[in-house]
Curated annotation (Swiss-Prot):
PANTHER family: APURINIC-APYRIMIDINIC ENDONUCLEASE, ENDONUCLEASE IV ENDODEOXYRIBONUCLEASE IV. The keyword DNA repair applies. Coiled coil: none annotated. This is Probable endonuclease 4. Belongs to the AP endonuclease 2 family. Binds 3 Zn(2+) ions.
Amino acid sequence: MFILPPPQEALLGAHTSAAGGLHNALYEGRDIGATTVQLFTANQRQWKRRTLTQEMVDQFRIALNETSLSYIMSHAGYLNNPGAPNPEILEKTRVCMHQEIADCISLGISFVNFHPGAALSDSKESCLDRTIASFSQMAPLFENNPPLVVLLETTAGQGSLIGSSFEELAYLIQGIKAHIPIGVCLDTCHIFAAGYDISSVAGWEQVLKHFDAVIGLSFLRAIHLNDSVFALGKNKDRHAPIGEGCIGSDSFCFLMQDERTRMLPKYLETPGGPDLWTKEIRYLQKVC
């Protein structure tokens, strides 16, 4: 199984817009001073995906070369529920997962990020097992060892979502890792909302040690940088600009400096758009 090597530089970017073509997300990344980006490869709120054409692939790969961006991440659609108890939704999700991963391989994308799923009316234990089965079924796509890693995103713990605890993510990874390349994308707002106090250096030290003990730091492959509108442990997913929420700017400077996290690709998902991201990237690169 292919193991994607870590970056050779500290990569920082944002979730940019693919309006008018997937390649435009890369050019917007260049314009805001990013060295990597996250994007949607299809409409995130629809089941039906547009067909990826060779022209789209060529445009994207040309833009990759022209912008020198690397370790691009695709964020899978919001309708996906890999652990859905409803058989129809589960099948739709698995079809979308297959198409998403196949498109990422064609485009030369490094990471594809998924929300782990929601139990809804069923137990979380059953949801976790269905999620493992969903991702394990993607194994044939990786037979030729494409340089792509599937990431499970940490969740805020709202409702019946799974993936808000490191223990749940560890259970998923143990069940999936023999079948496909798998890792974790840590969302700072989400883990704070789920009760992990990362508002100080001391807090981060405890959280990273706990992550390493439960999951293993080798599985931490990327970070979503978001401050939080709501206080610690409120299980509410509401992003705030860096330094303007309940986490605070010192937490993000820690991530930019600490040897365990400095080289992990980082993606802003803060509200405000390109103008704010330009300022945040400059701040994180220069001030931190």
